[in-house]
Amino acid sequence: MAKKPASFEYNGTLVKVLDGDTIDCYIDLGFDLKIKKRIRYMGIDTWESRTRDLDEKKKGLAAKARNKELLEAGVFKIVSYGTGKFGRVLGEIFVSPDAVGHEIAENVDRSSDGLVSINDILINEGHAYEYDGGKKKAFVAEIATEKAAKKEDLVDKPAEENQEEEWQKNNG
């Protein structure tokens, strides 16, 4: 990931996973003080799970499910880089390597206590891409390419086969 600004570290407890790159959690400030905040994962973006575009929604829901799975182990570490343009805390989330469920790539950030970055895990697994706050062009282009490929597949098949496939998809 890109160079990051000065940061602060906190322990967090999950309240709710909103999507693949945003959560609500309690941040432990110490001295028995906790605050509920919305955390936007810094440096990544995932497909939207609340959209009318069914292809994007499917990928967004997969990213959300993986994010939730990684956080279900309990307490995690939040490295906070301040507040973003929409008032959310910008951060990198670290969990136990045991939560990942597979071998961890060398390019995944690790904290000083051996925890691994969810932000990087989501990128490596294809649920997210690096994002600096600009226009979301990478996902838009990828979805457009996938839709074009689907249309091409439909054109190459006889009409009866397309109708049968559509009926099977809708009626199972």
Which stretches of residues belong to each language-model region?
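Small beta-barrel nucleic-acid-binding modules, primarily SNase/OB-fold domains
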Residues: 1-172
